From Swiss-Prot:
Gene Ontology molecular-function annotations: ubiquitin-protein transferase activity
Protein name (Swiss-Prot/TrEMBL): Putative F-box/LRR-repeat protein 21
Nucleus in keyword set: yes
Subunit structure: Interacts with CRY1 and CRY2. Part of the SCF (SKP1-CUL1-F-box) E3 ubiquitin-protein ligase complex SCF(FBXL21) composed of CUL1, SKP1, RBX1 and FBXL21.
Native source organism of the sequence: Homo sapiens
Pfam families to which the protein is assigned, alphabetical: F-box-like
Gene Ontology BP terms: entrainment of circadian clock by photoperiod; protein ubiquitination; rhythmic process
UniProt lineage: Eukaryota, Metazoa, Chordata, Craniata, Vertebrata
GO cellular component, one term: SCF ubiquitin ligase complex
Main location: cytoplasm
Gene: FBXL21P
Extent of the LRR repeats: 158-187, 190-213, 214-239, 242-265, 322-347, 349-374, 375-400
Pathway: Protein modification; protein ubiquitination
SMART domains: FBOX
Subcellular location: Cytoplasm, Cytosol; Nucleus
Length: 434
């Protein structure tokens, strides 16, 4: 007997509905077998199954799938799928990302604004894109956003928007959300009055504010956020608005333990900013209150601007020097940064850092990561540094040209010695030829 084949095209399934019977002949067997033909109806899949499938699909694929049937279209508009959305806005045909289609933006405004909870805006370097982002922000009235991120992929384009337009749009979100927990508004014209509105409406929920490089925010504005938002766990800001009063506010008995503090120390022109010193008792109060806090400092200074830093014990854990840093400063780091976990030196004045590196290994006993580029260390000193740190040095990234051969070790020998102390194979990084 020739069986009917299953056809994918017409979505047919054959099911045998009879229990197995002893074979008593061809016709008897045929009579006791009931073949049912069922049409596979994808539209009959339960909502929760389709919803799970849709959650793994990119938006465009999800939109195409929603046209399969009415049920799938209903699932397409379920609120769970619209809680997180990134608006991408650009004006350039050569941009590295595609702009969100205007029709989709309008559909979200009409149907899904109330569902949005995790929202970000990614814009290119044009002021027009930032203006468009502000226009959308100003319409976020009937939604309760929990996280908000404003991301400029090139230069900070939000700084090219008029301050009044930006602040007005952002204030709409601050007033209507009531449950903001995380905001990333770095390189924007946000100001002190808008921060007061932020904490007035979201003080109980705000945990992770990132407000570095906001020139219109003063130390008073940051202090208002730290003082009123007792649940802050992370904070990112510029050094010039760091004050002793801020540290004391973050260290109050009612404030939760701070987990992450990122401080950007930036100068575009030498002498433009007079960097003040944070008092040791302020650092001590912070560490006593939050003993496990990661203090991350990014330095983009000229060498003559380091006079203020590292003269006293500083509880920094992650330290990045984006410009040239002198031997003297690195020597102070070794003596006064006992909590240091990670150190990255992008450049120095090409004086060998042998003594400074060994000092860091001896005094910074928590150090687990080191990155060196455009500086010089003798092979002997480098091997001694690695021997002092041994296997706790889990990340070691050093350009080959940093290592200077001496009478004890050549470049061909150094990887064997370093690998022995690290307990794993290690080679210096090499600049590719292309």
């Amino acid at each position: 007997m020739k069986r009917n084949s299953l056809s994918v095209e017409n979505k047919i399934v054959q099911l045998s509905g009879a229990a197995k019977q002893p074979k008593v002949g061809f016709y008897s067997s045929l009579n006791q077998t009931h073949t049912h033909t069922v049409l596979l109806d994808w539209g009959s899949l339960p909502h929760h199954v389709v919803l799970q499938i849709f959650q793994y699909l990119p938006l465009l694929d999800r939109a195409c799938a929603s046209s399969v049937c009415r049920r799938w279209n209903e699932v397409f508009h379920i609120s769970d799928l619209w809680r997180k959305f990134e608006f991408e806005l650009n004006q350039s045909a050569t941009s590295s990302f595609k702009s969100t289609h205007p029709d989709l933006i309008q559909q979200i405004i009409k149907k899904h604004f109330a569902h949005l909870q995790y929202v970000s805006f990614k814009v290119d370097s044009s002021a027009e894109s930032a203006e468009a982002a502000c226009d959308i922000l100003s319409q976020l009235v009937n939604c309760s956003i929990q996280t908000l991120g404003l991301i400029s992929t090139a230069k900070p384009s939000f700084m090219n928007v008029s301050e009044s337009h930006f602040v007005s749009a952002l204030t709409v979100v601050f007033i209507n959300s009531k449950s903001l927990s995380s905001i990333k508004i770095e390189d924007t014209p946000v100001d002190d009055p808008s921060l007061k509105i932020l904490v007035a409406n979201n003080s109980d929920t705000l945990r992770l504010p990132k407000m570095s490089s906001c020139p219109h925010v003063s130390s008073d504005g940051i202090l208002c956020v730290a003082d009123r938002c007792q649940g802050l766990r992370e904070l990112a800001l510029n050094y010039y608005i760091l004050t002793d009063e801020l540290f004391l506010a973050l260290s109050s008995e009612t404030h939760v333990n701070l987990e992450h503090l990122r401080i950007d120390v930036v100068s575009e022109n030498p002498g433009q900013i007079k960097f003040h010193a944070v008092k040791k008792h302020s650092w001590d109060a912070l560490i006593k209150h939050s003993p496990r806090v990661n203090v991350v400092m990014h330095f983009f200074l000229y060498e003559e601007e380091f006079e203020t830093f590292f003269k006293e014990e500083t509880p920094v854990t992650h330290l990045y020097f984006g410009r040239s840093v002198s031997k003297v400063v690195l020597g102070r780091v070794g003596l006064n940064c006992p909590r240091l976990i990670e150190l990255v030196v992008c450049a120095n004045d090409l004086q060998p850092l042998d003594n400074e590196l060994i000092c860091i290994a001896e005094h910074c006993t928590n150090l687990t990561a080191l990155g060196l580029s455009k500086c010089e260390v003798s092979c002997s000193a480098f091997i001694r540094f690695v021997r002092l740190c041994e296997r706790r040095l889990t990340q070691l990234s050093v350009m080959e040209e940093v290592l200077i051969p001496d009478e004890d070790y050549s470049l061909d020998e150094i990887h064997t010695e370093v690998s022995k102390y690290l307990g794993r194979v290690w080679f210096p990084d090499v600049m590719p030829l292309w």
